From Swiss-Prot:
It comes from the Eukaryota. PPR repeats lie at residues 36-70, 71-105, 106-140, 141-175, 176-210, 211-245, 246-280, 281-315, 316-350, 351-385, 386-420, 421-455, 456-490, 491-525, 526-560, 561-595. Belongs to the PPR family. P subfamily. GO terms for biological process: RNA 5'-end processing. Keywords: Repeat. One of its GO terms (cellular component) is mitochondrion. Pfam families: PPR (PF01535), PPR_1 (PF12854), PPR_2 (PF13041), PPR_3 (PF13812). This is Pentatricopeptide repeat-containing protein At1g12620. It comes from Arabidopsis thaliana.
């Protein structure tokens, strides 16, 4: 930008072409001076509202070439116009060129400089300009101080802003509402919302009347941080203080309440604002619809959609997509399809989220042909599928045991510029593991690592489980030991897989050692861990140890579940201990559980070959 200015300053002569004059005529609503040429003074005084960079530079050039030189008020007017168009860096460059031309600043040009410096986060330069003001013998006014205070607050330097307020007061300047609003905003940006509220209360005590600008940042931070109860209290306080409310303030709190899951409170506030004469807009409706949909309350979401349409507020793609996704999750695919048709009839184009939700619905219903058709449709409409779209469809193929089709889609998606993520690889690896195609699964895992797609805890669980289930527990243990040494945080789920794999490989003693070491690793066993270990001990024939562990799990705060009881009942039946099994059956009933199909089958088989009395069967009912 500076280079552009310097280049223009090297140019000589008057305005260069008729085309250029024509441009000025359009931009500045120029007035002729009788010679066909419009002076810079007339341009500046004609009330410029907007100005482009090139035009500002050219006008500045003309001003610096003029003799006698323009007054500083004319430069101030130009800088103000450029600043209003948010070309702050350009203003600073023009100010620099003015200095190089030997044109001294005054209070107004320096104040404009300070404002621009603060706007583009150049605070050191802003304070340098402040120093020039004092050096030239001017006294900074309240506006200048407030500008610097706001700049400090936007940078998160609130303590320095407060010090500057003290200095401002010492110099005899009283802070204005603009000053205090800047401080409130700064405190909120730093997450100090309680301090912001205290400052507002002090403002009121000292005679200041806060306005809607004061409260806006506080409400936003409160709602963003989940402090919606405090936001509601503040709203009531605003009403008491006769602060002007609007739909935006209600929208902030409604959004916060929806994100907190307080949907009924959000809906009550929605009704309250309507009663008070504030009309809900598309943003508020969409916020509520999404909130209800995420909570599974599709009926309330659908009612709001109909209410929108009734009030002539056209729902957008976000509202329709939220409802379609909710219908899919609730298993209401037909309703989702109907809503998709309706949005098209209303001229609303579905987006990636819409199509992806419908593809998800078709995959869940095993309608893969329709899912593929929807994928083709979205591409034909110029709507690009994302990684989630492909992950859903690949998962659909895997669930339908069409793993090769899933792999083919996986290879094709890279041609569309979509990069596979951890979920993509996890889905395919699990699919191949479940089909017993362990070599392909291992190859995919290696490909995942080589392509720098970082495996997560789920990736390792899938791989370790696949290795254990497909007869490679040693390889699973080798990988497990590596990740245990890494910085990855392991949960009880991954330990359960390894303990289960060891038990199935008849390495019950090793499994027991790992089980006993869990507390030392800072990992708490869950009911599944106990069930696996009890099952392993039973499989080994160590029923007394299994019974002891069964009682110990209760002491450790883990109540046995139906699976625990069934494991022990079958183990004792297998050892011919009908009495112990009978006691466990009575206990399982008291706990509200029931014997499972495997236990019933075992009892029936034992009855048929005479190993149990027929009276034992009555105990199961």
């Amino acid at each position: 930008m500076r280079g552009l200015i310097q280049t223009r300053l090297l140019e000589t002569g008057t305005l260069r072409t008729a085309l250029f004059l024509s441009c000025y005529g359009r931009v500045f609503s120029s007035v002729s001076d009788g010679k066909g040429k419009v002076s810079y003074r007339e341009r500046l005084r004609s009330g410029i509202v907007d100005i482009k960079e090139d035009d500002a530079v050219d006008l500045f050039q003309e001003m610096t070439r003029s003799r006698p030189r323009p007054r500083l008020i004319d430069f101030s007017r130009l800088f103000s116009v450029v600043a209003r168009t948010k070309q702050y860096d350009l203003v600073l460059d023009l100010c620099k060129q003015m200095e190089l031309k030997g044109i001294a600043h005054n209070l107004y040009t320096l104040s404009i400089m300070i404002n621009c410096c603060c706007r583009c986060r150049k605070l050191s330069l802003a304070f340098s300009a402040m120093g020039k003001i004092i050096k030239l013998g001017y006294e900074p006014d309240t506006v200048t101080f407030s500008t610097l205070i706001n700049g400090l607050c936007l940078e998160g330097r609130v303590s320095e802003a407060l010090e500057l307020v003290d200095r401002m007061v010492e110099m005899g300047h009283k802070p204005t509402l603009i000053t205090l609003n800047a401080l409130v905003n700064g405190l909120c940006l730093n997450g100090k919302v309680s301090d912001a509220v205290l400052l507002i209360d002090r403002m009121v005590e000292t005679g200041f009347q806060p306005n809607e600008v004061t409260y806006g940042p506080v409400l936003k931070v409160m709602c963003k941080s989940g402090q919606t109860a405090l936001a509601m209290e503040l709203l009531r306080k605003m009403e008491e203080r006769k602060i002007k409310l609007d739909a935006v303030k209600y929208s902030i709190i409604i959004d916060g309440l929806c994100k907190d899951g307080s949907l009924d409170n959000a809906f009550n506030l929605f009704n309250e604002m309507e009663i008070k004469g504030f009309k809900a807009d598309i943003i508020i409706y969409t916020t509520l619809i999404r909130g209800f949909c995420y909570a599974g309350r599709w009926d309330d979401g659908a009612k709001l959609l109909r209410d929108m349409i009734k009030r002539k507020i056209t729902p957008d793609v976000v509202a329709f997509s939220a409802l379609i996704d909710c219908f899919v999750k609730e298993g209401k695919l037909r309703e989702a399809e109907e809503l998709h048709k309706e949005m098209i009839q209303r001229g609303i184009s579905p987006d990636t989220v819409t199509y992806t939700s419908l593809i998800d619905g078709f995959c869940k219903e095993n309608q893969l042909d329709k899912a593929n058709h929807m994928l083709d449709l979205m591409v034909s409409k110029g709507c690009g599928p994302n990684i989630r779209t492909f992950n859903i469809l690949i998962n659909g193929y895997c669930k339908a045991n069409l793993i090769d089709d899933g792999l083919e889609l996986f290879r094709k998606m890279s041609l569309r510029g979509v990069v596979a993520d951890t979920v993509t690889y996890n889905t395919l690896i699990q699919g191949f593991c479940e089909l017993g195609k362990l070599e392909v699964a291992k190859e995919l895992f290696q490909e995942m690592v080589s392509r720098r797609v970082r495996p997560d805890i789920v990736s390792y669980k899938i791989l370790l489980d696949g290795l254990c289930d497909n007869g490679e527990p040693e390889k699973a243990l080798e990988i497990f030991e590596k990740i245990e040494k890494s910085k990855m945080e392991l949960d009880i789920g991954i330990y359960n897989i390894i303990i289960h794999g060891m038990c199935n490989a008849s390495k019950v003693d090793d499994a027991w050692d790992l089980f006993c070491s869990l507390p030392l690793k800072g990992v708490k066993p869950d009911v599944k861990t106990y069930n696996i270990m009890i099952g392993g001990l039973c499989k080994k024939g160590s029923l007394s140890e299994a019974d002891l562990l069964f009682r110990k799990m209760e002491e450790d705060g883990h109540s046995p579940n139906g699976c625990t009881y069934n494991i022990l009942i079958r183990a004792h039946l297998g050892e011919g201990d009908a009495t112990k099994s009978a006691k466990l059956i009575e206990e399982i009933k008291r706990c509200g559980f029931s014997v499972d199909a495997s236990t019933v089958k075992m009892v029936v088989d034992m009855l048929s070959d005479g190993r149990l009395k027929k009276s034992f069967l009555d105990m199961l009912s």
